Amino acid sequence: PGYVGIPFPDTEVRIANPDNLDETQPDGTEGEVLARGPQIFKGYLNNEEATEAAFHGEWFRTGDMGVMEEDGFIRLVSRIKEIIITGGFNVYPGEVEEILREHPSIDDVAVVGRPREDGSEDVVACLDLADGTALDPEGLKEYCRERLTRYKVPRTFYHFEELAKDQMGKIRRREVQADLIRRLEAEKD
């Protein structure tokens, strides 16, 4: 997540209502990032089904949720596939991670969904703590409550010695989530 700048010349980008991609969101409102222009690819070779899923009319569906700021800059919020649905609300992991990374006891963080029996998820934070720092779940909850809407506050905080990352050092949320689920299963036994 973060700012990606303004669209390239001859490229149009718009933020669409996720529930109705024909509707453009007002500036400052989150939505699905769509793009079109001469440099956008035309589709997947020999895969019409994937091409249809990747486009809404002539607009390419980037797979990102973002905001068009009033100055025309685009801020990415999260990947659509990483959205956590809790209590009927959408939580974008990147937004919660951004807040937690500002906390002095946290070196790095991955916010993921912990599956519940009813099919929804709990928002949880997997933390790589700064050296010499102890996990303080209540302190972290209070810190988050002061900065986030109630439903975005992680229910639980887990300490990890190391969070799964790719070669570029970017957190791999799906791997962290899988590591968490394995850990929780092992704790049940």
Each model region followed by its residue ranges:
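General small-molecule cofactor/ligand-binding pocket signal
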Residues: 157-160
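Conserved AMP-binding/adenylate-forming
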Residues: 1-74, 81-83, 96-97, 132
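Acidic/polar alpha-helix N-cap and adjacent early helical turns
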Residues: 178-189
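AMP-binding/adenylate-forming catalytic core of the ANL superfamily
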Residues: 37, 42-43, 65-152, 162-164, ...
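Residue-level detector of flexible, active-site-proximal loop/helix-junction positions
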Residues: 15, 20, 90, 164, ...
